[in-house]
Amino acid sequence: MMQDLEILDIVDESDCVIGQKKRSEIYSQGLCNFRVVNSFVVNSLGKLWIPRRSAQKRIFPLCLDVSMGGHVESGETYEDALQRELEEELNLDLNMVNTQLLGYLTPYKYQVSAFMKVYEIRLDYEPDYNQNDFIESFWLYPSELIEWLNKGEPAKSDLIKLVQMFYAN
């Protein structure tokens, strides 16, 4: 959906909906009180499937990203958004993959970009990803990914924090 048309719920510190705004307004105002979902695809070797965002992305173009991420649109639950984004970005059906919730994070407690639920999807093959969203991908151990990021590989802002939180030993 085009950013100018996408309406997101605005939430209070308890993640209760208090209003709505256009996605473009949220970003132009630097707000963090909206909802997102993020997922990591992990194979049986413990490697993360990490894609690189396309050059057409308005935010973080050509940066490494979580395996799947997206905004929770107004009126959706986190789980609704997970299902929609899995289909849009990775051509996966939520009911056909092994998914587990890794955690629920808030910007006030964890200094992340938004209220978020982070999931893990177990797959031993590369997803059939949407090539409008991503241009390439890598299977990396968490330690390899952290090393890349520490050496300056461009990445979406929350990526290193999420990998360290959920996958660093």
From Swiss-Prot:
Family matches, as PROSITE patterns: NUDIX (PS51462), NUDIX_BOX (PS00893)
Nudix hydrolase domain span: 32-162
Transmembrane helix is among the record's keywords: no
InterPro entries named in the record: NUDIX_hydrolase-like_dom_sf (IPR015797), NUDIX_hydrolase_CS (IPR020084), NUDIX_hydrolase_dom (IPR000086)
SUPFAM superfamilies assigned: Nudix
Protein name: Uncharacterized Nudix hydrolase all7351
Pfam family, one: NUDIX
Highest taxon of source: Bacteria
Motif placement: Nudix box: 69-91
GO molecular function: hydrolase activity; metal ion binding
Enzyme's top EC category: hydrolase
Keyword line: Hydrolase, Magnesium, Metal-binding, Plasmid
